[in-house]
């Protein structure tokens, strides 16, 4: 489906890391907060845990549980998508764009936001702003485009 991605992966130019969605969000949030790492049970005993530090901690009931160390993400560049921005970089997200754009923006040294509309400073209702302009270094007014995805592939469920 993506021949260039396939070529880079097979030639060793590109690495793939498996990371559960919630763990990815927390890794970005941790990086944005300056937290170098955290322990989680998510992924223990799976491919996700291979090569990572394991440590046992007691749970709430005192039962020892194995956790894996996940490192915070500290990016050089974060590229995010927002619905609307004002001239000072305050952003408003819509729908599912509210999920990962905020932690993605904060974990990058430089944040570039592509937006659908730029309004004058002071035009956005402060109660509607999702990300303060202090986290945004550049705003790019995007052109309308069709959102294209690769072919959806799902695994059939086994029947009992």
PLM feature spans:
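Conserved alpha/beta enzyme-core scaffold
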Residues: 1-160
């Amino acid at each position: 489906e993506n021949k260039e991605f396939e070529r880079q992966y097979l030639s060793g130019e590109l690495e793939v890391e498996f990371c559960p969605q919630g763990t990815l969000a927390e890794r970005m949030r941790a990086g944005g907060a300056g937290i170098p790492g955290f322990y989680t049970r998510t992924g223990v005993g799976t491919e996700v845990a291979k090569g990572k530090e394991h440590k046992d901690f007691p749970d709430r009931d005192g039962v020892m549980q194995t956790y894996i160390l996940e490192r915070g993400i500290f990016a050089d560049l974060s590229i995010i998508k927002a619905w609307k921005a004002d001239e000072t970089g305050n952003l408003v997200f819509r729908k599912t764009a509210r999920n990962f754009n905020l932690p993605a923006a904060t974990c990058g040294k430089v944040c570039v936001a592509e937006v659908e509309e730029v309004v004058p400073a002071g035009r956005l209702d402060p109660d509607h702003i999702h990300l303060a302009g202090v986290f945004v270094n550049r705003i790019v007014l995007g052109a309308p485009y069709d959102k294209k995805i690769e072919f959806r592939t799902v695994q059939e469920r086994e029947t009992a």
